[in-house]
Regions:
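Substrate-access "cap/lid" subdomains that shape
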Residues: 3-7, 12, 17-157, 181-205, ...
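Coil-to-alpha-helix initiation sites in intrinsically disordered, low-complexity, charged segments
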Residues: 79, 161-162, 377
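Alpha-helix boundary/capping residues
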Residues: 9, 87-91, 96-99, 170, ...
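Mobile gating loops/cap/lid regions near enzyme active sites that modulate substrate access
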Residues: 201-391
Length: 391
């Protein structure tokens, strides 16, 4: 995680530039990581205690969780340390998988005060005393579509026919296109808020130079009557194909992703690689380009100024600068009025969007969202759907 390295005191001064693509800046909870799970098994972080219990069960030392806790209570710290250090990586990973709680999401770094500062990644980025390096940071417009496309509650999968019948399972149709687009839009915007806009604001606050982008290319083909621009769009990791273009020549990528847009995709790829290479060499994506390209603006905190670059092909909007900026209050206000949802839908959307996102949403935001009408609702069905997702 480049963001974690950028924020780590141990890495301070070890590099001259940093590129953060679709980063994660939220951190795990130390208290949850060091404690037993509550009785309902809901926790946002995998517990080291629970992993240790699972190891004792897997090794046959304890029959169940109760026995594992009883056995552990009789061990000294040095005995526990010796037991853990004797475990193989495979044993540790197997125990971690079995010990996952309800609600836990993507693995996040721990603000242990040594490797990562106790005030977390964002806190470190705001510190003007840190060594200053130029940063290139961004996300893709439709980040969450890659994950939503694999959710059987949102997309119907099945056996394709015709030319594609040799494939066992493919996405066949989006069950509710308006809902799918809305959930993907908010999920991706929340990601951009945390991973681009908030990061850029924090770095700018500490007087660092930031170049931000949003990748918008979505000229995917239609397969089995399903438009992959709607299904995947500018999804997570899509920009990597344009930075490592040899992947575009692979048969599946050329058929399922690039389609007939190879020429414009190649042009965008070359422009992106020019920017990335210039930044890697000089810390300035506009310096030393082999041919004229749109100027990449430095992120600025002022209102109504060009602050990030939109990366798209010349068959669409092309490469353009944008003055847009996301804020939590702005996203919540937009969701609160979005006609694609009724009130219950808005409440469920906010619940789902924030269920596994690490730092979560400030409880005060829940108090004020929709005048507090989302506070006392039953989210059990949504929770069950979220916990069945396997990405």
């Amino acid at each position: 995680n480049v963001a974690a390295l950028l924020a780590s005191p141990l890495a301070d001064g070890l590099f001259q530039k940093a590129i953060i693509q679709s980063g994660i800046v939220s951190v795990a909870s130390l208290s949850e990581a060091e404690s037993d799970y509550p009785s309902d098994g809901v926790s946002g972080t995998i517990s080291s205690q629970e992993i240790l219990y699972q190891l004792l069960i897997n090794d046959g030392i304890a029959e169940d969780l109760v026995a594992a806790k009883r056995h552990l209570a009789n061990l000294t710290s040095s005995e526990i340390a010796g037991y853990l250090r004797a475990q193989t990586p495979a044993n540790l990973l197997q125990a971690e998988q079995a010990a996952k709680p309800r609600k836990v999401g993507m693995t996040r770094v721990f603000p242990d005060g040594v490797v990562v500062r106790s005030d977390g990644i964002v806190g470190a980025l705001k510190d003007p005393a840190r060594t200053k390096v130029p940063v290139l940071v961004g996300t893709n417009r439709d980040e969450t579509k890659l994950f939503n496309a694999m959710d059987p509650h949102l997309v119907e999968w099945g056996q394709p026919d015709g030319l594609w019948s040799f494939i066992d399972r493919m996405p066949l149709t989006i069950k509710n296109p308006n809902y799918y687009e809305a959930m993907s839009e908010y999920g991706s915007d929340f990601w951009k808020l945390r991973a681009t806009d908030d990061v850029a604001r924090s770095l700018t606050q500490s007087e660092q130079t930031v170049f931000a982008y949003r990748f918008d290319w979505d000229e995917l083909p239609t397969i089995q009557d399903l438009d992959y621009a709607d299904l995947l769009g500018a999804g997570h990791a899509m920009e990597l194909l344009f930075l490592f273009p040899a992947a575009m020549e692979q048969t599946l990528v050329s058929k399922f992703v690039i389609g007939d847009g190879a020429e414009s995709a190649d042009r965008l790829s070359q422009q992106m690689r020019n920017y990335w290479a210039a930044f890697a060499y000089t810390g300035k994506p506009n310096l030393g380009l082999p041919a004229p390209q749109p100027t990449w603006p430095v992120w600025q905190a002022a209102d109504n100024v060009e602050r990030f670059l939109v990366l798209d092909s010349d068959q669409d909007q092309g490469i353009v600068s944008s003055t847009a900026a996301l804020t939590l209050n702005g996203l919540l206000a937009k969701l609160e009025q979005d006609p694609r949802f009724d009130l219950m839908g808005r409440c469920q959307a906010l619940y789902g969007l924030t269920y596994r996102n690490g730092d979560g949403i400030d409880p005060a935001a829940w108090q004020t969202f929709a005048a507090g009408q989302c506070l006392d609702r039953d989210y059990q069905t949504v929770t069950q759907l979220l916990e069945r997702q396997q990405f």
